[in-house]
Amino acid sequence: MKKDYAKKRYIGKIIVAFLFGAAIMAFIRYISYGGMNSGTQVNNEEFLKVAEEIDDIAIPKNVKIFALGEATHGNKEFQELKLDMFRKMVEEYNCKAFALEADYGGCLLVNQYIHGEGKNTEDDAVEALAFHIYQTDEMRALIRYMADYNKQAKPEEMLSFYGFDMQNSDLDQKCVDEAFSELKMQYTDMEDAAETLKNIPGMEMYAQAARCYLQNQELSNASNVDYAKIRDHYMAENIDWIYEHVQKGNESMLMISGHNGHVAKKSTYTTFMGEELFEKYGDDYFVIGTDFYKTECNLPGKNGKRITRKFYSADPLANTAHALGMDMTYLDFDKLQKSEKIKEIINKNMLMGSLGEGYSFLNKILPNSYRINDVPAELYDGMIIVKNATPTDIKN
């Protein structure tokens, strides 16, 4: 009897150990995929009917503002797309200006550099973007392309670089101070600076720097609840100003680039930038969002260090692109007549990846913290899907 009891006890321990090991393996699999697998797929043949190459992307001729979204801030491919798409807009759609989700003052210094003004170097221009996420070779390549283009262009054909964010006011103040130094004038406060500069010919861009400084002051005093709403409202207002400013020199399209969540035509819980722009410009505002099958994303860690973490979007379209071995593909939501099944999918809620400039271990165990569940056709006019998004290499 004692031997039988000991044997049963031994077997019981083995079973418990096996179940514990299986639970650990299941947990590891869950936090790796954000579920027990990377999600569902759509029919391969249906997907192939509508999938296009990036080079084949076309947008309507009436578009005034073209927006390129990014599913994360920490992937090389999404930054490379900024240059790829901007070059296409310049060469095929008479686009003369690019605006980035970055502080206005820093981008004004970049604009001076690409126009050959002042003593700033290419390194200075990249550094002026301030946000760590932009200290990359990919953003340097975009700035270099614009600077090289302008060296060969007539003054009225030159490209311009703008920022529509206002989270750092230091460079806004620097630009305003430089303007008043050049004018040999003084200002009492930033309201006075904005009012004075807007009435002086050639100083409109510096007046906008003063306005962005004031926006930052309001944003700094906002509650956590109101912060995102105020920021996105001002970003929409700034893009509207940039577009109108661009038209004064030479009527042309404006390309903007920011996170998917900012540029999307529909907001989730509050009115974001893209929704405001869509309400004003309607079909003249054209948005291409992005997503990934798998991302190894560069994210902020503790003590200012950068880390890389892996996530899966569970996007059925991205899963299909992965299964077909398509590194990067484009779906134009207005050209889905060849596949009613795909058209039906993008007009229903589906999971998509979404990572900002923040990370917590909870992201690994709470998939909804890095995914959205929304209707693609209500957010975008088309989507670029990246199979495997690789991390950016931040230089500073």
Model-derived regions, located:
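Juxtamembrane low-complexity tails/linkers enriched in Ser/Thr-Pro and polybasic
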Residues: M1-A6
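Structured catalytic-domain cores with a bias toward divalent-metal coordination
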Residues: K8-N396
